A protein has these predicted regions:
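Intrinsically disordered, low-complexity terminal regions
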Residues: 1-301
Length: 301
């Protein structure tokens, strides 16, 4: 047997073994293409911060209007307005800040783009506005679905909200407050205050000026009042009233329809008292202090 003839069986065995090796696996399939955007679906663009600065003299008028978000206003000693807005919107519903001069006064509005008349899912835009403003001014602040908060101001402040709370602190002059489905809280006011809320409580602390406030379906808590001789009128429907008069004096009348009634004022002279009414003279100023509720208790100290 020659050398070459000896290698022939080995070659045949190797060929058989190679034939038994499985073929290489096929390459993995390509990833699927991303789904096409759904028709009528609004894609959010994320949140962003925008800032504006505008000159405004002390004692000027300022209007601030928002639609879906809060307004927070703080007075400072600069003759300018510094606005910071936290905005969340989408490609189809943009939020734009519009500042307009009205002579020496200023109007600021967060303008919300309206969706087109088509079926689909839309992102609800939101804008939270924070402002530093001249301390002395005549301010008008209004929003929907958000809180209106104002502090450290002198002059006049009108705060309006729908589905939101109103918070006013350390203001001198005059304050008007109105909201629906939200509380009213006022603290440290050297100012008269009037207004109303529906489905919200009222909290008052350290109020020097005259008061005329009412609520529906909410309680009233008031501590350390004065009245400035202008009078105090607190009224609720379906809510209790609790008052600590503080420095407030005058002719006190408290009435309710259902609920207990208790008036214990140091130095007060009881003119008349029944189960659901009390007339007490508190020596001092000649002002009317009237507390009224339906379906709620009244406590006066």
């Amino acid at each position: 047997m020659t050398v070459s003839s000896r290698w022939i069986p080995l070659f045949l065995v190797g060929s058989a073994l190679l034939a038994q090796v499985p073929p290489a696996p096929p390459p993995p399939p390509a990833p699927p293409a991303p789904p096409a955007p759904m028709i009528g679906v609004d894609v959010p663009t994320g949140s962003r911060t925008e800032q504006r600065t505008e000159k405004l003299a002390q004692g000027s008028k300022l209007w601030v209007k928002n639609r879906n978000g809060g307004i927070r206003v703080t007075g400072w000693d600069k003759d300018e307005v510094a606005l910071t807005a936290q905005i969340r919107d989408s490609g189809r519903r943009r939020v734009e800040l519009v500042l307009q001069r009205k002579g020496a006064d200023l109007d600021i509005e967060a303008v919300f783009q309206q969706p087109s008349w088509s079926f689909g899912v839309y992102i609800s835009p939101r804008c939270e506005m924070t402002l530093m403003v001249p301390r002395k001014l005549q301010g008008h602040f209004r929003t929907t679905n958000g809180t209106v908060a104002a502090e450290n101001l002198e002059g006049f402040a009108r705060c309006e909200a729908t589905n939101g709370s109103i918070l006013v602190t350390h203001i001198r002059g005059e304050v008007h407050v109105d909201t629906t489905n939200g509380p009213i809280e006022a603290r440290g006011l050297a100012a008269r205050i009037k207004g109303s809320t529906t489905n919200g409580r009222i909290i008052l602390e350290d109020i020097d000026g005259g008061i005329r406030l009412e609520t529906t379906n909410g309680s009233i808590r008031a501590h350390n009042l004065d009245g400035w001789g202008e009078g105090i009128h607190l009224e609720s429907t379906n809510g209790s009233i609790e008052v600590e008069l503080g420095k407030a004096t005058g002719d006190l009348i408290a009435e309710n329809s259902n609920g207990s009634l208790e008036v214990k004022v140091s130095g007060g002279q009881v003119i008349e008292q029944t189960k659901h009414s009390a007339h007490v003279k508190v020596p001092g100023r000649n002002q009317a202090i009237r507390l009224e509720t339906t379906n709620g208790s009244i406590r006066v100290r």
